[in-house]
Structure formats: C-alpha cells, structure tokens
C-alpha cells in the first residue's frame, strides 16, 4: 500500500473513532465527577456511590460526603503518592522471597527507587530490562496497580481545577480527593482498559502468568522466550498514558503490539481520554465552545508535529535509506513510517512514553520534533488529566497577556486573574524548564557522562551533538513524566538514577501543588459578568492567542538548547 494512503487511513480511523467517542465519553466523565443528577460542578451530595466504592471508603475510613479545600486535597494526594512510592520500593526489594518470583532476586536499591518514583509519577521511565528484573507479582501487584492510580491522580487534579473555575464557595472547596481517585479508577480507567485488553487479545497480544517458554530454534539450539500477563497491562499502559512496557522492546515487541490494527488501537487508547476530557471541561463549565477551543489548540499543535515527523522520516537520506524508500532504521516493518510516526507523536504529545520504534534512530529533524513535543509541556493533547490542567494553566497565562494588551483586568470564565493567580500559573509552567535545563547542564558538564553516551566525540562533531540530544531528551522525558528515551544513553549510573528520579518527582508534584493552589484561589471568587470589553476564551482569536503563547514560551525557553542539539545536527 502507498505510504501516503496508509498514513491517511490510519489518521482518518483515529480521528473518526475519537469523534464518535467525544461526546458520550466526555459527558460520561463529567457525570462521574459531578453526580448523576447534575452536570454542574456542585457538591458531592448528588453522587450515588456503588457498593464497591462504599466498601473502599469504609476500609479507608473516608467520609465521601466531606469536601476538602485545596490544602486538604493536596495533602491527601501527596500522602497517597508517597505511600505508593514506599510500597512499590519495598515490593521490589523483597520480590525474591515472594510468590511468582520466577527465580528473580531483589531489585537493587537505585533501580528500585527510580522505578518506584517512575511508576507513581505516571512517568514509567525504565532503567532496567523488565524480563530479567521484575517478577510477575511485582508487575501485577505493583506496577500495574500504579498504572491505574497514577493516571487517576492526574484526573483528580484536572477535575479540581475545573471545579475551581466553576465554583464560587467562600471556603474554596474543590471536592474530595479520595472520591475522585476511586471513581476515576473504577468507573473510567478500569472499564476502558478491560475493553482494550480484549481487543488486543484478539490481535494476538499474549496473556500468561508463566515467566518463560523454552523453544527449539531451526538450528537445534534452545531458545528462552519471556512470557508475562501482557494484554492486561498493555491496555492500562496506553489508556492511562503510562507507557512502561512489560517487555523490554515495549510496543515494538510482537507480544505487546502484534499487528498494524493493534498499533492503531493502542494509539487510539493513548489519545481517547485526553481528547474527550476537553468535552468534560465544556460540560462542567456549561459552555461547549470552551472545550472545542482547547481541542483546536491541541489539534493544531499535534497536527503540526505529525506533519513534521512524517515528512522527516519519509525523506530518505543515504544509499540504504533510498533503497528502502524511507528512513526505516529502528522501525518495525509491520508498522512502517506512518504507524511509527503517528505513534511517536502521540506518545510524546501525551505523557505516555510507550514506543513502537527506536526514537534514537529517528532523523535529526524527526527526533528534534519529538523532543519539542515534550518541551511544549505535553499538552497536545497531554496525559490523562495532566494535559487538560496543563493547557488550562497556559490558557490563563494567555488571558493575562491578552488583558495586558487591551488594558483590562484579565478574567478567565468570569474569574479575575490577579497577582496570586498568575503567580501560581507561572510557577507551574516554570518548573519543567528549570528541571530540564539544570539537569541537562549539570549532566553534560560531568566528565563521567561521556562514558554513558552511545554517541560522543570531539565538540562540534555530529556524534557529540547527538550525544547532547540524548541527554536533553532524557531530562525532557523525566521532567514531563513521559518515560521514553533516546536509547543510546545508558542511565544505570547512580547519578542518572538519582537525578532523573528527582526530576520525575519534582516535575510531577510541584506543578500539581501550584495548580491546586490556583484552583483554590479561583474557587473563592465570585464570577464577574462578561462585558463588551471582556476577552472571550473561545473562538479563533483566542485559540490563536493560546497557541501563540504555548509556542512563545517554549521558543524563548528552549531554543538555545535545541540549537545545540537537534537543530545543529540537522544542518550539519
């Protein structure tokens, strides 16, 4: 099949499926978080809890009818997350004496710390080989569970911010974190994951509690083939925008992603919740135009990145690439350029980080676009929850800039954006660039770093430039809770394990704290009626301002770093 036709069919299928799911799934998620009798972000008294939910609240000694201010909401979220880090760390350290160990011993302290932080922060950065490091019990009880709850945590923050925009309560209550966490996990993530797992099973994705299978090759030698409960974890890996593979090759492995159809299904699973959350936002604020405007910004950025990556990888350079007809190094033949490019842009535009191709083998322009996709803040369309609250924070900054241009006090959906609000929004946006640039700068300054780079050499050579891009990609991935990597960089040293672990922690929880503080301050305000001079946050004009703000922030912050890495590599 012609490559352009294949690309068009895949993109068309994904867009059609998202369009079909947009209204029903978006409205359903709004009902999950606002109760069955009202789509307004009102109190929790209208929510009907299921028996399973009531049992969980009873065991956890949680009063589901009690609401929390932003401080209480934040403390609950942080307490739950850090308890999860400790549990997952201990589980890895004692897995050798637990059932289903498969003969695997305890995970080393550095790897256990990095992995615990990685999965709790929804990053799923993997500095280990899953088949030879993690037991099936650790995968199922530890990592798979975190795939659900870490995604649900992102959902809770997005919903809390929407409530902050909508509500006008004197106490600034944002809801109940525990209720939002449980309902997001049980009513959204679990059903969708079950459906996707069944589809993947039909395509040949494996599901086994056995650790390995012994086969005999054609030459008579024995072959040790790793097995695992792949389908169940593969589904939530994509639905929850997690990305950590149960097998080392991730979604390039035929046991995880066997066919072109399964590849498209996984792409759809990655995008469906972040895209449909814009409808949830529309429904909860009572204005359908708001979500469509946000979606148009996401779609513009996503489409631009997809066009750039597809063009870069479809333009053969060199004799081997010209013979193949495209830049096929590091890509699976069963997916080709269209499937690999669409998957790569989807996984870096969200916080997923799953891969069906080797990103390190992409061209300088293609790989640079993937880095930039993360450096935009992963808002096109972003991770589960994280993409929505990230792009709404940038919308508030765009409103502030627009207000300054017209000489009016900035307002966002009737709420004034004053010094406290813009400070919280700015701090939320500045965390990631600080972590990326500081982490990259220190790492390349260390003399030991070159020993861990697959590409190094004299300064200014293509190899050394690509080595810099590998380090930049690593910290962009960690700080944005993405988890993908340029595989040429070895990250098993204590420095990378610790520094990337801290980048994941701070990159996840500092923006959450600032976003919830912003939501709390907005919730206490009364709405100001719109007037003739109000800057409306819907329509093409604001969409353009919003998109321009996103690109301007990224360009001013990261252009020097990109010029030293992928841009320099592309022009050499």
Curated annotation (Swiss-Prot):
In which compartments does the protein localize? Cell membrane
Primary location group: membrane
What's a Pfam family in this record?
A: KdpA
**InterPro entries cross-referenced by the UniProt entry:** KdpA (IPR004623)
Q: Which UniProt keywords apply?
A: Cell membrane, Ion transport, Membrane, Potassium, Potassium transport, Transmembrane, Transmembrane helix, Transport
UniProt similarity note = Belongs to the KdpA family.
Indicate what this protein is called per its UniProt record.
Potassium-transporting ATPase potassium-binding subunit
